[in-house]
Amino acid sequence: MPGAAAKGSELSERIESFVEALKRGGGRRSSEDMARETLGLLRRIITDHRWSNAGELMELIRREGRRMTAAQPSETTVGNMVRRVLRIIREEYGRLHGRSDESDQQESLHKLLTSGGLSEDFRSHYAQLQSNIIEAINELLVELEGTTENIAAQALEHIHSNEVIMTIGFSRTVEAFLREAARKRKFHVIVAECAPFCQGHEMAVNLSKAGIETTVMTDAAIFAVMSRVNKVIIGTKTILANGALRAVAGTHTLALAAKHHSTPLIVCAPMFKLSPQFPNEEDSFHKFVAPEEVLPFTEGDILEKVSVHCPVFDYVPPELITLFISNIGGNAPSYIYRLMSELYHPDDHVL
């Protein structure tokens, strides 16, 4: 069994390396990279570990999932992928167990709320369960690879010629969305710089290289400029269970200004960012970084007298959002609960 031991050791090292990277903040990895890497590790866990039935496998996935999410609670994509895999295990077990897909669907809100109490032991053994689960995970990985392209393909439905579009900070999804629209439409993009991180400058450079007329402005000018804007298009870190956003700091200000001027606010986000979390879960919601960009350490006299916090994310309530554009189409914030019931099982909301 030396081969199996070596494989197990290599997998443990990969998981440990991933957990350490999460603790350090994930570096420059995008949410899509995180999702893909999480799925890859879970697939290896399923193939390399020994388990005899779906119940044991789900407990194994939950244990590793808790370990990954505890390393960086604010990186909700990791937990979302763990829940997607748990849902896949339940569905594949149900098919082999002889339960039809229709009976497993939650076609009403009442059933969605009560289904958490219906438990199944998942103790029956099926030889082909592993291969079916791996195949479903591979399909999910293929789906992940096309998420940005699927969102960008909808750009021409929402962006029209000579419009003024506002965005904030840097988002790969929004950049792809605007680039796709620019292939056939001419429009002007205003980018709020998103201080103190100033990621908006990177966004503006990329859009300018694509031939899009782009202007960078300070966050303080958002309200003054909003009256000229036709649409606000933003990305987000997480879509919460109530249809709200956990987005980069400054987004709430932007959303309030858009609401005041009745400017549509569109959120471009793939489905893997949809999380069953609610905004009252403070440990996983808040993330603070060193406030050096706000108040440099050279300001010694002031530093002795003040305590400075630098939050990374804003909470944006659902009533400020007009439309979500995901890889499966456009939806209103009120429809999020339905999408969530299709992605995650109620028993898996808490790992």
UniProtKB/Swiss-Prot annotation:
Protein known as: Translation initiation factor eIF2B subunit beta
Top-level taxonomy: Eukaryota, Metazoa, Chordata, Craniata, Vertebrata
Subunit text: Component of the translation initiation factor 2B (eIF2B) complex which is a heterodecamer of two sets of five different subunits: alpha, beta, gamma, delta and epsilon. Subunits alpha, beta and delta comprise a regulatory subcomplex and subunits epsilon and gamma comprise a catalytic subcomplex. Within the complex, the hexameric regulatory complex resides at the center, with the two heterodimeric catalytic subcomplexes bound on opposite sides.
Keyword Protein biosynthesis attributed: yes
MF annotations from Gene Ontology: ATP binding; GTP binding; guanyl-nucleotide exchange factor activity; translation initiation factor activity
Cellular compartments per GO CC: cytoplasm; cytosol; eukaryotic translation initiation factor 2B complex
UniProt keyword annotation of Repressor present: no
GO BP annotations listed: central nervous system development; cytoplasmic translational initiation; myelination; oligodendrocyte development; ovarian follicle development; T cell receptor signaling pathway; translational initiation
Keywords linked to the UniProt accession: Cytoplasm, Initiation factor, Protein biosynthesis
Regulation acting on activity, per entry: Activated by the chemical integrated stress response (ISR) inhibitor ISRIB which stimulates guanine nucleotide exchange factor activity for both phosphorylated and unphosphorylated eIF2.
Gene symbol of the encoding locus: EIF2B2
